[in-house]
Amino acid sequence: MAFLIHLLVCTFGMGSWVAINGLWVELPLLVTELPEGWYLPSYLTVIIQLANVGPLLVTLLHHFRPGCLSEVAVVFTVLGVGTIACTLFAFLWNVTSWVLGSRHSIAFLVLTFFLALVDCTSSVTFLPFMSRLPTYYLTTFFVGEGLSGLLPALVALAQGSGLTTCVNVTEISATTLSPETTRNMDSPQGASSTLVSKLAGTAPSGIHLESRYLPANFSPLVFFLLLSFMMACCFISFFFLQRQPKRWEASIEDLLTSQVTLNSIRPQEGKDLGPPEESGKAQDPPEEKTAPQHLAHLTFIYVLVAFVNALTNGVLPSVQTYSCLSYGPVAYHLSATLSSMASPLTCFLSIFLPNRSLPFLGVLAVLGTSFGAYNMAMAVMSPCPFMQGHWGGEVLIVVSWVLFTGCLSYVKVMLGVILRDHSRSALLWCGAAVQLGSLLGAVVMFPLVNVLRLFSSADFCSLQCSA
């Protein structure tokens, strides 16, 4: 029975971010298909953070009107909306509309908002629900949350999304064009574009390389249908989890009974040590000393949670195309997918190698931040980053993204475990810190990418960088 509950909890955790993680790993294909192009990741980052209105509303209601929200009903609503939105994505992802004189993926962006609303709200609804379960199920939940990145990444690897080839293109100077001149640019899933010309009176003026996107093994329609299936599995898992509260309530009652027994014994033990007044006086000073330390302890944890999530959910995702795509589509594809796989593997590792030491977690956060700084530096140097055109540069950027995600994922998991042992409300505020950090990261990066345009893009095949 315990194994079944672990399986249900893992599947339930998978639904927390599977939809948005699915969008991120599909980006190598989507940036070639949608009119936003290289700017698409920064658009997604801002839209995802705008969806923080969901967790903000839930947090405020919990604080000012505790008990007014049915926890189970909210989770069911979140999972239902996520399943429906993923299904609509499969059929509307490439629908574009004219806005302000140019084409934009309005349907894609609107559905992204609803998916983000689901996933962001899960941070302040799923974790409080997990407080009903024994502590050891929380690690299983984080493993499932990590699988929300692993499974879409595996599907994206099988899809082979966003891969390109370089082809020679001959430029021609036309003097007289025959009526038979045609240019075929229709290519579902980024298939290679071809130029077929039957020209009269033309002369070649030059040859250069251009990128041509190879067709994926299966379309985004299939990919998004698989995402909707994963969300449906999460919905079903939660249905069975919330229908078995009696076992957990019984275990809580047993725990409370044992605490009552211990409390009834402790005064008797105190009588042997001296008068109650003296023992009470002796205990007061340590409590006064530890209160500020306890506050500083929690403050450090919440600040670290916000900082780590600002990097992983707001700052670095906005510039992943710029830091990776200059090294080629393969480097971008592997960085997006393998870094998504690093998160669940790190969560799984934390089961066997847990370390709750805050100094250790602080050092690990600094290490992960250093890898993030390298990724950001390569994005700033785009389209000619360090070792561009050399296989060593491709390896470095992929490894850097994997280690960046892995280090900070471990920090996030262990901070969540620490707060789970503290109290139920601590997990709620942990979710709020997650979303606040993510929001700040996105708000900082969007104007840098889309307004000031500090990052430059280029065609990989025609790119010429000085040695």
Swiss-Prot record:
The keyword ATP-binding does not apply. GO terms for biological process: cellular response to heat; flavin adenine dinucleotide biosynthetic process; riboflavin metabolic process; riboflavin transport; sensory perception of sound. One of its GO terms (cellular component) is plasma membrane. Its main location: membrane. It catalyses: riboflavin(in) = riboflavin(out). It is found in: Cell membrane. Residues 266-288 are annotated as: Disordered. The chain crosses the membrane at residues 3-23, 44-64, 72-92, 106-126, 138-158, 221-241, 295-315, 334-354, 360-380, 395-415, 426-446. Belongs to the riboflavin transporter family. This is Solute carrier family 52, riboflavin transporter, member 3. It comes from Bos taurus. The lineage of its organism: Eukaryota, Metazoa, Chordata, Craniata, Vertebrata.
